[in-house]
Structures are given as structure tokens and as C-alpha cells.
UniProtKB/Swiss-Prot annotation:
Native source organism of the sequence: Arabidopsis thaliana
Record gene name: CXE11
Compositional bias annotation for Polar residues: 26-35, 132-145
PANTHER family referenced in this protein's UniProt entry, alphabetically: ARYLACETAMIDE DEACETYLASE, CARBOXYLESTERASE 11-RELATED
Tissue specificity: Expressed in roots, leaves, stems, flowers and siliques.
Keyword Hydrolase assigned: yes
Protein name per UniProt: Probable carboxylesterase 11
Catalytic activity: a carboxylic ester + H2O = an alcohol + a carboxylate + H(+)
């Protein structure tokens, strides 16, 4: 059984959640509450500021990718992306030049898991001055102290010739459609953990919340980010091609290259972290709670559009305690309807806020993954890892979905965690528990099967 602390926190959590849901329902009755631009976080949410330095092994930055909506992403770039192609040395960027750190046994600096603790504190102290000088744009080797007009974050080398390419993970946070955010303290911690364990670039998606934006806004936002990732890859390739092209008498000027890119793709900027370090042909989707429903939607849309997404390829997805429901209750829905943190009545309220009133049904295609007529056929779905908790009333439907995938020969294992509750690996209070740590390691072990073997991954 969960600990006494978890039980007490669950009571407090459910009280606050019920109060917030009721307030949202009251406000949703006012037509003025509809906002096409949308919101991606709530005032009560504790957020973590982005940090473009590798202070704990992962650098982060926020990008607003759609001028018409509030859709945004937070990029989590692990320090392992700076490892040069030569395995004998590791690279740091110092005053715009590459310097090497030799004779570091076991490459402790780049250890993903050790960087969660403080075992590297002495070494990190020695290189802190170098990390603070990442990406100075003034051209000077030591900008004035206290200068506020100088970017001190990581900036890849303009040549990009020695860049290491990492797979990409699109992460969709939970929160019952109406709360949560990609930059919350809890989600920031979880994404940093996944970036280190999986050795992967994480894009945490800040999708629009309900009731200001109802279905399919959040799901479409998820797919829009996948298309944006493909556009970034094409922009980077175009930039590289134009930069390498020559004309009689000299090289093409950078300004002229940028003009050609703008003419071809519109006024979109190439994201340097992704251009230098991302391999979109190895893309994993990971969704937490209702975010798992978004991940499943994005996977289905990716199958429908097929090669139009090139070079992006979804090679696997991870569904963490998905927010599935249906009109016919399962065994766990009957026995554990009043379980910890998210009980069934409150989740139904959340679905009423998310689905348009005229479309509300517990068998809506966004709610029930096993309704007849849902496309595409399950046999085309990517390998799917499902994480479930013992004390979660949504468990049985997630397991049933996984069983249907296995019937059509999709690799779809289920990992069930004993004495665990919904969001046991992502909720703020539970993030540092042994179960949460073990879950992250299990996800990394499974995901690496599909992101490490080039040429053997799933493709549509």
C-alpha cells in the first residue's frame, strides 16, 4: 500500500483539484472564456526558469513556435551532445573555441545518471568557468562581469562539423487537460531525468489547456510540434546546402543564404540546438496521463501522413498511465474508482471540460482507444511501452489497449509498478522516490532498443 504521506497528500491534492475543476466548469459557461490563443500554464503552477548552461548536465531553452497560439516547447539538451565524434576525448566550448578534457577516466563528466546527484561536484567546479562562457556573441574571450546584453548560454559552433546527433523525444505533460505545463518544476525535473537516462533531446510540449481550448486543440498542438520538428530539419539541411554552395569568385555570403531560406520556407529561424544535434529520424513520443492520449493521437496522425513527415520518423512511443476511459467500466474502474489523486468522478469532470459539449462521450475516440472504427489499424502503430500503477483505476483499460496491440504483432509490453499510484513517476512529491527512478531507467532501457539501432527501427 502507498505510504501514509502519500495518502495524506492525495487527500489534499484531490481537494484542490476538485475546487479548481468546479471553478473551470463555472467559467466555461461564459463564452468569453474561449481564447483561440490559449494558455499553456496556470497562475498556481510553480514553474522552472530555462537554463541554457549545462549546470546539471542538461541545458534548456523555451521557444514559442506558433505566432497564432500559445503553443511552445522547452528543449532539453543533454551535455552528452557535446561529445565529439572521436571517442577518446570529450569537448567543452570555451570562448568560442573547442578545448578538450583529457584523461578523465570513465567519462564521469558525461555520465547521465551520476549527474542526478553530487558525485561530480569537484569536477564540475573546475570546469564551471568554461561552462559560463558558452556561446558568447561579442567575440571577446572574457565579457565584462555583470553584462546583461551578452548571451551566456550554449551556442553550437557555426561549422557544426563535429556535432553529435541525438534522437529526439516529444514529451506531453499531464494535468487532466486543464492544468500542468511543460515548464513546471516537476515536469522540468522529469524531462531532465529522461534526457540524461535516454541520452536524448527532449522537447516538452506546452499545448493549449481546456476549457479555453477544447478538443482537438491540445492534440493538434502535439502534431504541430512534430511537423515543426520536420521543418526545422529541412531548414537546417537547406542552410547547410546553401552555405556549402559556391559561385565563381567566392563563397555565397551568409546573408544571401538566409535570404534564400526565407524565400523558400518563410521567415522561420533555424533552431541551432536542433540543427546541430537532433536526429529527427529517431523520434520517440512520451505522454504522461492525458499527455499519453496526445502521444497516441500524434502517433496515429504520423502514420496517416506517412512520408510527408520526412525526415521525421516516429520509432516508438511510451504511454505513462494513460488517461483512458470508456462507457463500460472495467474491473479496476469499479474497484478503485475512488483511488489516489485522480478519482473517477473528477476525471469525468475533466473530460467534460476538454470535449466540446456536443461531442461529450466516454467513448469518444480521444477517451477510449478501443472504440470501433478508430483509424488507422492497430497493426500500423509503433512499438508502444505502457506504464501502469497498481492503485490506478485507469490501469485495466491501458492494459487492454496494450493487449490489442500485441494481438497484431506490435511490440507493446506493459510495466506495472506495485504499490504505485497514478503519476507516481511524475508528480512533484513522488519524483525522487525509488519507484520513480526505477521507472525512468526502465523506460530508457526499452527506448534505446529503437533509438540506438539505425536501420532497424520501426517505420510506417
Amino acid at each position: 500500500m502507498p505510504s501514509v504521506g502519500v495518502k495524506l497528500y492525495s487527500v489534499f491534492f484531490k481537494f484542490l483539484l476538485k475546487h479548481r475543476l468546479q471553478n473551470r466548469i463555472q467559467s466555461s459557461g461564459d463564452e468569453s472564456s474561449s481564447d483561440p490563443f490559449g494558455v499553456t500554464t496556470r497562475p498556481e503552477e510553480s514553474v522552472a526558469a530555462p537554463n541554457p548552461l549545462f549546470t546539471d548536465g542538461v541545458a534548456t531553452k523555451d521557444i514559442h513556435i506558433d505566432p497564432l497560439t500559445s503553443l511552445s516547447v522547452r528543449i532539453f539538451l543533454p551535455e552528452s551532445a557535446l561529445t565529439p565524434l572521436e571517442p577518446s576525448t570529450s569537448a567543452c566550448v570555451y570562448s568560442g573555441k573547442a578545448r578538450t578534457l583529457n584523461n578523465i577516466a570513465g567519462s564521469d563528466l558525461l555520465s547521465r545518471r551520476n549527474s542526478l546527484g553530487s558525485s561530480n561536484s569537484l569536477l564540475s567546479h573546475k570546469v564551471e568557468s568554461r561552462r559560463n562562457s558558452y556561446g558568447y556573441t561579442t567575440g571577446s574571450s572574457s565579457p565584462e562581469a555583470g553584462s546583461s546584453d551578452v548571451y551566456r548560454g550554449y551556442a553550437p559552433s557555426s561549422s557544426g562539423g563535429n556535432s553529435r546527433k541525438l534522437p529526439v523525444m516529444l514529451q506531453f505533460h499531464g494535468g487532466g487537460w486543464v492544468s500542468g505545463s511543460n515548464d513546471s518544476v516537476a515536469n522540468d525535473f522529469f524531462c531532465r531525468r529522461m534526457a540524461k537516462h535516454c541520452d536524448i533531446i527532449v522537447l516538452a510540449v506546452g499545448y493549449r489547456l481546456a476549457p479555453e481550448n477544447r478538443y482537438p486543440a491540445a492534440c493538434e498542438d502535439g502534431f504541430k510540434v512534430l511537423k515543426w520538428l520536420g521543418k526545422q530539419a529541412n531548414l537546417a539541411e537547406c542552410n547547410k546546402s546553401m552555405g556549402n554552395s559556391r559561385r565563381p569568385g567566392g563563397e555565397v555570403k551568409k546573408s544571401e543564404v538566409n535570404k534564400h531560406i526565407v524565400d523558400a520556407f518563410g521567415a522561420s529561424l533555424v533552431e541551432p540546438w536542433l540543427a546541430n544535434h537532433a536526429d529527427p529520424s529517431r523520434c520517440v513520443l512520451l505522454g504522461v496521463s492525458c499527455g499519453a492520449n496526445i502521444a497516441d493521437y500524434v502517433a496515429r496522425k504520423a502514420i496517416e501522413v506517412g512520408q510527408n513527415l520526412d525526415p521525421v520518423k516516429v520509432v516508438a512511443q511510451v504511454l505513462m498511465y494513460p488517461f483512458f476511459i470508456g462507457s463500460v467500466p472495467t474491473q479496476s474502474e469499479i474497484k478503485q474508482a475512488n483511488s489516489y489523486f485522480y478519482d473517477k468522478p473528477m476525471c469525468i469532470l475533466a473530460w467534460k471540460l476538454f470535449l466540446p459539449e456536443e461531442e461529450f462521450s466516454l467513448d469518444h475516440q480521444a477517451a477510449n482507444p478501443l472504440v470501433p472504427g478508430r483509424s488507422p489499424p492497430l497493426k500500423f502503430m509503433p512499438p508502444t511501452l505502457t506504464i501502469v500503477a497498481e492503485h490506478d483505476w485507469m490501469r485495466d483499460r491501458a492494459i487492454a489497449y496494450s493487449e490489442e496491440l500485441r494481438k497484431v504483432n506490435v511490440d507493446a509490453p506493459v510495466l506495472e509498478y506495485k504499490d504505485a499510484v497514478h503519476e507516481f513517476a511524475t508528480l512533484d512529491m513522488l519524483l525522487r522516490t525509488p519507484q520513480a527512478q526505477a521507472c525512468a531507467e526502465d523506460i530508457a532501457i526499452w527506448a534505446k532498443k529503437y533509438i540506438s539501432l539505425r536501420g532497424h527501427e520501426f517505420s510506417y
